[in-house]
Amino acid sequence: MNAVIASYLTQQPKPPLLKGAGVRWTPLHFNAEAPTEPAGETVGFCLQKRRKDSFVNYFVVNINYIIYKGYFMDILKQLENEFSLKAWQVKNTVELIDAGNTIPFIARYRKEATGSLDDQLLRELNDRLAYLRSLEEQKKKIISSITEQEKMTDEIALAIENAKTLTELEDIYRPFRPKRKTRASVAKALGLDGLAEKIYAQEKGTPSPEILAQEYITDEVPTVEDALQGARDIIAEQVSDDSQGRKLIRYAVKNHGVISVCGADEDLGVYENYAEYSESIKTIADHRVLAINRGEKESKLKVSIDFDKTIAFDLLYNIHCKGNNACTNEVITAVQDAYTRLIFPSIEREIRNELTDNACASSIKVFGENTRQLLMQPPVKGNVTIGLDPGYRTGCKVAVISETGKVLDTGVIYPAPPHNKIDEAKKIIKNLVKKHNVKMFAIGNGTASHETEVFAAEVIKELDCGITYMVVSEAGASVYSASKTAAEEFPQFDVSLRSAVSIARRLQDPLAELVKIDPKAIGVGQYQHDMPQKELSAALDGVVEACVNSVGVDLNTASPQLLSRVAGINSSIAKNIVLYREENGEFTSRSELKKVAKLGPKAFEQCAGFLRVAESKNVFDNTAVHPESYAAAKELLKICNVSESDIKTGNISLLKSQVETLGTSALAKQLDIGEPTLIDIVSELSKPGRDPRDELPKPLLRSDIMGIEDLKAGMELKGTVRNVIDFGAFVDIGVHQDGLVHISQITNKFIKHPSEMLKVGDIVTVWVLSVDAEKKRISLTMKKPK
């Protein structure tokens, strides 16, 4: 705070602004609750007004006052309550975030400080922290603005202090916000605000409005009706700006209003179900909100909110109609105008925006979870793979990929129409299989996929050597193949061949390949193109970051795109790591990272534990044990009589038995580390270089093919969940058209969302309910037929 103001404040008498029982003025000393100010310096007076069992604090500035409620500490308390956490957990977590630590680092290596909060909860807490800080900043701006206007009162100050959302703040600030030209502002400019005040007061004995209006007749206001209309316009705006009334109307509309939809076009197409549709605002599902919004955007639907205006009028009359005279009748007219012209259209927009925001947040969450499951699909390692990017006129692009993802061979075949060179294509593929000892085919699911799948199944049958295949999502492959990243990686290949390489690698290691693609292009969600792109990108980037750091990254083989997703590493540092690798050969230890340009101590601290160096002499370098814990890990091995060579060979039975005998609590104290860190160290040393994806069910590989025409009601099939959405899940059953398991067909028990039972990549048993071959619709159930 400015020293001049501080000096001025200390000399002021106790301001007589607020009086009453439970009010007292005391000198205010800044302390830890106001960390930005000098500790112990008296800079003003603090009003403490007893409210239940708490105090509300104000600072006084020039006899106007602003709130400075130690907001940092209040935010911590709010986070503590909202997330059901202990005070120390929130305090430590916020301090770690503010110190520039990444979420993956905090989740993995600061468990003692946070109480082992997981990555997802930390991200939610971080987002909420940002929102609450934004809210406090907005409060300060509003306080400053109202104070400058010399309109601050104790009621307004309390209302601002109590505001929990930006919407509440906007309601409070509405009367003080600089306005564009309105009917009310025009009336005020004509000097009619005095008339409006007299009419709104509705005092007994007040002359009739017509008599009152006579005093305001001028050249600009030639008639009594003109004067009364101007007064009503001023009152209407006053009613509209009243935060209490808006709050009541908003609550009533939210709880009793109805979304009404009707067709706006003769050909509604996919929106036929919404031709004459209505549903309570309280119960409408998120996916229906998004569907209706899209239909409205495409000019297929008209959407509105229906609400009984007589209820709204009664709510507003209770606030603004204080008498029962001629002036009251004018106020009633103004209230009705305020609701119809100003309040309801605003509330309608606000509620629809809120419904959309909530639906988008839900959809983004589903999209993120689906993306997480897709990225965490188990890799199919150790097999030479042929990637097939199907096509008709331009042919099917072929790429042979080694066990480590290196391109061994490429080509183009033409087994599909209009060429139909099936025999020639078979000969080429069989030669490639024999030449490179191919064990798997990865087939893109785009154009001509079905014909290519039939062709591949025939080749596999003729070879009869145990080859399997899988249809792989092409989503984003074309985006990647035409990108600068792909051009830098494969300058010698044309765009189409790069797609074939990407398809093969997606089967071998989905995570390593998919990180090269904008996660929005992966296409596992609902209405992703209708989402706020900034929020969607932030959420998906967080998911990708969490997945990459959960698995860990091989420092000597990772692409720049994969490295840039590691905690503490940006794209510039990632490129420098690859450049160092090219100039100096493979990394031989984690500590060698410190030699990379722009990778400073903080970046090293954040990233080191997530990077693996399999070739290092130090066994810990190929685990998730952080370098800061190496000394403790070595001491642990010494205590347990286990050598580093035992860890390398997997001879860890003695380590486990010794830890169990000695006890984690006693061992942690002896090693001077926390129990969570000790548990993680033991887990990592038990399986050095482990990949958490290996513990998940393997992808469903096939060797034969079925068509949609082969499906019959009641048929039992194995399938892979490809997408989970609000109303069900789409399952790949090997017929080129995913079937829908409606939420009602997932289980016999009640579930709110399909994600409670299913996730992308799950292998499930389903039964065919019905097939519409013409519309290519397959209905499935997971409930076993009786």
Language-model features: locations:
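Accessory alpha-helical DNA-binding modules that contact the DNA backbone or grooves
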Residues: 102-103, 118-185, 189-218, 550-695, ...
